[in-house]
Regions:
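Alpha-helical segments that scaffold the active site and NAD(P)H-binding pocket
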Residues: 25, 52-53
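Aliphatic-rich helix starts adjacent to a transmembrane/signal segment
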Residues: 31-48
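Extracellular/periplasmic head regions of type IV pilus-like filament subunits
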Residues: 53-146, 150-153, 160, 170-176
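N-terminal single-pass transmembrane signal-anchor helix
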Residues: 4-32
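A short local loop/turn or secondary-structure capping micro-motif enriched for an aromatic residue
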Residues: 165-169
Length: 176
């Protein structure tokens, strides 16, 4: 019998390496998913802050102290400008951004301030006395866990169930 000089790894050594990689992956993947959800939630909060800012600017410059009732109206540029009040990635109600659906509407107690034809950006709906915006995860537990809402006051609220926050913020808590 002739002995050969073997070079390389044995099957056992390779299996041990694969098992170690599997254990590391099992530990790391849930943390990465939680980090992704936290990032999506931070993006949703940022979107609501951008909406608050856009609504404030719309009200003071274009809506005769009234607020827009849709993202479409916020995305329209005022007379003499080429840019709307909100970034193009938030240009329509129901837009999906970072795993969250974002919407703007009039608040439940909103009254008409000025007709749509009287706004300076050709809004499709009348400017109203108060607005409501919400962002909820498309897939609760996967793209995000909490839902968020805000209104004319500018305070952001959250709900841990992931269901869309209702106008009036019933059942929601103030985000610290």
């Amino acid at each position: 019998m002739k002995m050969r000089d073997s070079k390389g790894f044995t099957l056992i050594e390779l299996l041990i390496v694969v098992a170690i990689i599997g254990i590391i992956a099992a530990i790391a993947v849930p943390g990465l998913l939680r980090a992704r959800m936290a990032g999506n939630e931070a993006s949703a909060i940022g979107s609501l802050r951008a909406i608050n800012s856009a609504e404030s600017t719309f009200s003071s410059s274009c809506g005769a102290n009234g607020y827009a009732v849709s993202l479409e109206d916020l995305s329209k540029a005022p007379t003499g400008s080429t840019q709307g009040f909100i970034s193009p990635d938030l240009a329509t109600n129901g837009v999906i951004k970072s795993g969250y659906e974002v919407n703007v509407s009039s608040d439940t107690s909103a009254a008409t301030i000025t007709a749509a034809s009287k706004t300076y950006n050709g809004a499709s709906a009348a400017a109203v006395s108060s607005y409501f915006a919400e962002a909820h995860p498309v897939n609760v537990g996967s793209t995000g866990q909490r839902s968020f809402g805000t209104d004319t006051r500018g305070t952001i609220y959250f709900d841990n169930t992931g269901t869309a926050v209702a106008a009036g913020m019933s059942g929601a808590s103030v985000l610290q």
